[in-house]
Amino acid sequence: MMAVDKHFSELRQGDIIFLDFNPTKGDEQKGYRPCIVLTKPLRYLNYMFGVAPITTKAKQFPLHVSLTPEMHVQGEVLLEQHRMLDLETRSFKFVERAPIDLVTECTIKLKLMY
């Protein structure tokens, strides 16, 4: 798995990136970890991105989405932990792009929360 630098303006919905989630509180996912970009680029807030962390500790939960076996990053997307982050001020590394089916499943489940 080769992580590469990208400018935040190059990120797209479905990109898998590594970034530092700190600072966090309570049971929020902490530290440097993979996540999926959930939002499409916003013209008026192009530095703010909705992301959800990915964990390797799989648990059966309705808001978790398993990554596909052919992906470099393995685990489950934790949609209940999604949040907006300013990626202009946080360093991150691009790893890969998720298949469209996985992105669609994430966005459908995310919409169920609102």
Model region roles, listed by residue range:
Residues M1-R33, V37-Y114:
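Conserved functional hotspots at enzyme active or ligand-binding sites that engage polyanionic ligands
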